[in-house]
């Protein structure tokens, strides 16, 4: 496993439509392992293959309280329900977060890392991850959904925590 460099805006790969994974071979298994390691190293909740410079339809993400990362190859969102206001960031747009609307519930289908077809229905944060990561595969970023520039915020450095109260 290797930690890969995360592509950042304005790198063109982030705006291109990714190609379907033609077959799940050793190179795809390595890519999956590298993406999971990279996501964990960057303390991210999800990662799409284009974010590590590979234009393939593959995403990984961490569901809250799950032991293993979820892998979805050639994902397709088949249903969206409801709406909710969310705050969202992206490893490819460091230093910023935005306020936008996402679906409350998302159902997606695709293949697991072994080529087995499955469906996943996510609500709340999981729905947000499915939508965000799948959009990466079509060159869409969360900033494309912002209603106005005022909805994009720069992350401010945290105040220094006194040594005596650090964990």
Swiss-Prot record:
tRNA-binding as UniProt keyword: no
InterPro entries per UniProt: Peptide_deformylase, Peptide_deformylase_sf
Swiss-Prot/TrEMBL cofactor(s): Fe(2+)
Alphabetically ordered keywords of this record: Hydrolase, Iron, Metal-binding, Protein biosynthesis
Active site: 133
RNA-binding among keywords: no
Biological role: Removes the formyl group from the N-terminal Met of newly synthesized proteins. Requires at least a dipeptide for an efficient rate of reaction. N-terminal L-methionine is a prerequisite for activity but the enzyme has broad specificity at other positions.
UniProt name for this protein: Peptide deformylase
Organism: Dehalococcoides mccartyi (strain ATCC BAA-2266 / KCTC 15142 / 195) (Dehalococcoides ethenogenes (strain 195))
Gene: def
